[in-house]
């Protein structure tokens, strides 16, 4: 399992970090900036391709949802943010969002639909 997550992170973290990348090795994705909007759209596509229902709320937060089979009205939330400060690092915020998505995808693959809905 650790090997799976290590490989998944090594494949997806550079991809996610490429949006808003700057020449010094950091990235800048200020809230509602073109870089942030592009990242949101690309991350949404990846989540949808993995079988999650995706949506944006009124302020632009992105959700990926896997409906529960027994208690769908009970929702477990996990995640983080993908906006950054100027020249931010690649683990701040986006790593939490990425980790939540990868964990949900792995659990779905291993065990099928969860009893409770996860987002």
Residue spans for each PLM region:
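Intrinsically disordered, low-complexity serine/threonine-rich segments
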Residues: 5-8, 84, 92-95
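Structural signal for hydrophobic packing residues in well-ordered secondary-structure cores
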Residues: 13, 17-20, 50-54, 104-111
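A non-catalytic alpha/beta surface segment that caps or lines the substrate-entry region
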Residues: 21-67
